[in-house]
Amino acid sequence: MAVSLAGCGGSSSSSKSTESGEKVFRFGQSNPKVGLDMQTNTNSGASSVADNVLEGLYRWNDDNKEECVLAKDMPEVSDDGLTYTITLKKGVKFSDGSDLTTEDVKYTFERMFTPATGCTNTYMYNMITGAQDMLDGKATELSGFETVDDYTFKLHINYKFAPFVANLGMDYASIYPSDACAAAGENWGKGTNLIGTGPYVIKENDEQTKVVMVPNKNYHGKKVNLDRLEIVYIDDVSTKMMEYEQGNIDMCDLDTSLLDQYKDSDLKDEITQVTPLGTYFLSIKDNDPVLSNKAVREAISLAINRKELCSTVLNGAAEPASSFLNPGVPGHDDKLKTYEHNVKKAKQVLADAGISNPTFTCKVRQKEEKIATALQAYLKEAGITMNVETIDAGIWSSARAAGELQSTVLGWFPLYADADNQMYTYYYSENAVGKGVFYNNPEFDSLMKEARESNDSDKRVELYKKADYILSRKDYGTIPLYYGKLQFVAKPYVKNAKLGNLIYHLYNIDIDLSKK
């Protein structure tokens, strides 16, 4: 894998910011409704909030490059690739005034592997020696964490793992203050119970309408530009844009369903479009009585007109999928064409299998409702009934984790360009259970495992191509739909407005008061 590493070393609020000279920035987004503990969720909305408070040893910046944050340098790796020595920066404090030491890093990883935590991302780090013993309840300490002194430690892993350093740069490995986190217990990540070394601290959080943040007086890095950062929760995409037009928020995402309405409006110069690394797909519960039949899954794929979906419902802001892996991720097979659309063939596949009018339910969040409704119409033409139900985002997250969704529509985005981060995390059999898809193919698992343990980038690419083909074209274990583009709007006075790969990094935002 070629990893690019950077060098280390309401409207009333808006008017008040102008009158008082204070810089107040209000960002509108949907409510993730999963809390802000990044060990227990994979929600990008939660990341966009917690990202301002928490920091890890490393991070992926807006330019998709990994850089040092709490670590002084990139790790020193042993010749056998199994030991990583990391030194922390000295003088770093958490926002509560406590010093960052090796003990906090140790606590963070041990909390991650403690079963009671319910960490959703252990598969990214469970190659650390002793992690599985903790997950199995056989140990309470992480044997692969070796403390050298207050600022230096070693991580021992069981096998060579090419993306290990890359994974250390993800939000899921944010470092927590041991004393404060332990004291908060189950309330960690709820309300204002989130303390980090990041540039902001949470002043208010009612978990329903908004999160208010102010600068961290103990921050070790460059002073932030804002006096106040507000994350305003607005679930309805049309309401969100109305609030933006009325000046009640300064920046928000622009849902693709509304792009046609705004692209030639007075706001056209305030729209920025980006192409992330992810894939949108119809996620299927592969052990469901109806959907466990491969013929049904194949017929579903054949019935969907992806090109039309992209040009009409998505207003041209997407490309029809040809594999589960995004074209920007090594392992995507550029030789593959868009998945076939053939209603007649879909009907024949069902007939050959002796299946008549298969029926299932697709439960989605409000933002995916239009996509699901379009899919419903396509499937109906092939004699497949897909009932669509729109449910609360919080209920959706819980139902997906519990394996209670027959199907749903969502996007899955790696935070850096590596297939392990996009495909292993969702469809490796042990992880597929937690994602509610229950895909299980030993051949696929074997290819993914071999790719994980190889440091040969060319070999990894070929292994991922084979795995993707098995997943999405042989088994139809997932139904890739399209590679979407994302849009956001920002007022002319907002400076440094950028979207990383799905995550809004708001800590660099500034306000030009002279333009308000």
Q: Can you describe what each PLM-predicted range is?
A:
Residues 185, 216-262, 385:
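Ligand-site clamp/hinge motif
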Residues 488-516:
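Long beta-strand-rich cores associated with HINT superfamily self-processing modules
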Residues 101-108, 150-156, 198-199, 226-228, ...:
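Alpha-helical secondary-structure segments
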Residues 87, 106, 122-179:
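Surface-exposed binding/hinge segments that line
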Residues 28-79, 195:
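N-terminal lobe/hinge region of extracytoplasmic solute-binding protein
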Residues 157-223, 228:
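Gly/Pro-rich hinge or "lid" segments in bacterial periplasmic/extracellular proteins
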Residues 75, 387-389, 393-396, 401, ...:
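Extracytoplasmic/peripheral linker and loop segments enriched in polar/acidic and small residues
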Residues 292-377, 381-382, 387, 466, ...:
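Append "and occasionally in soluble cytosolic enzymes with long acidic Gly/Pro-rich linkers
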